[in-house]
Amino acid sequence: MSLSKTLIGALLASSVSFAAHAEEVKIGVPSWTGAQAIAHVLGEIVTSRIGGTVEYVPGNNATIFQAMDQGKGDIDVHPDVWLPNQESFTKKYVDEAGTVTLSSNPYEGNQGFCVTKDFGEANNITDITDLSRPDVAELMDSDGNGLGELWIGAPGWASANVNEVKTRDYGLLDFIEPVRAEEAVKTARIKDSIAKGEGYAFYCYKPHAVWFMFDVEMLTEPTYDPAQYVMVQPSDDADWYENSMVATKDALKEVQIAWSNSLVDRSPAIAEFFSNFAVTADDVSGLAYEISSNGKDPAEVAKEWVEANSDRVDAMLGL
């Protein structure tokens, strides 16, 4: 770092520290690892480079967006908004209510369904429809109920709702049981299935630590077609399942942070930083891997990342 940047950084930190009571933020922390990683990177930069104070608040998408909309400071920022998965929330609070700001610096996300490479190769599983084969479903049936388990996501995930509709519209329900459980359960099941040579299929996405942790492959799906992708979320319609139809792969995603507009008045330096914050899919995969596979604390991983990427952080802070 140059001397001028060092001096500017010191002045910024000291000026913000002088009014530290005004420069505080509560960061929402969803359950998936990538979101936890980004939340702590945001928090590390706020504390170590801006001089503010941070509180981490666990919550699902609905809880975080509702708190940002209220603007009372209960939760100020969502660290990992996947679009169009969470579009029902951004339409309501960003486009219509105008109470939440969505970052203009997204990274690219991709999602689908995966199997371990060994399981896929041994049973010629390459496409989502292969899961409807009775021989494959039998290999994935760990509880003996006659249906193979397919992890579709965690409770509260918009993507889990999409995947529940997909299992129906891909014609899998005669053979497959969609399962919702926390992501840690899925990770443990992947590890266990590999150790025991069992079959397992699961919702997967990039960026994610799973690509570093295990040898997995994403199954093919019909190419994204908006005419075959009509998804209604529970927040918009109580009959969302009946009124949805998804028989195609998801489009590539844009993933970014979002924050309450009230933050601009309460913590302007932090809000300005959020507007410039940017990471890549590779950044997020690497961070998630350190947390999930190497068992590091998210705060420790974030601190190491910020120290290793000081020039990029400087740019986000306008230094």
Residue ranges and their predicted role:
Residues E24-H40, N61:
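Extracytoplasmic "Venus flytrap"
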Residues A39, G59-A97, A188-R189, A209-F214:
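Pocket-flanking alpha-helical
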Residues A67, I75-P79, W151-V230:
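Ligand-binding pocket segment of bilobal, Venus flytrap-like solute-binding proteins
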Residues G98-W151:
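A conserved helix-loop-strand patch within extracytoplasmic ligand-binding domains
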Residues D250, L263-V264, A271-L319:
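C-terminal functional modules
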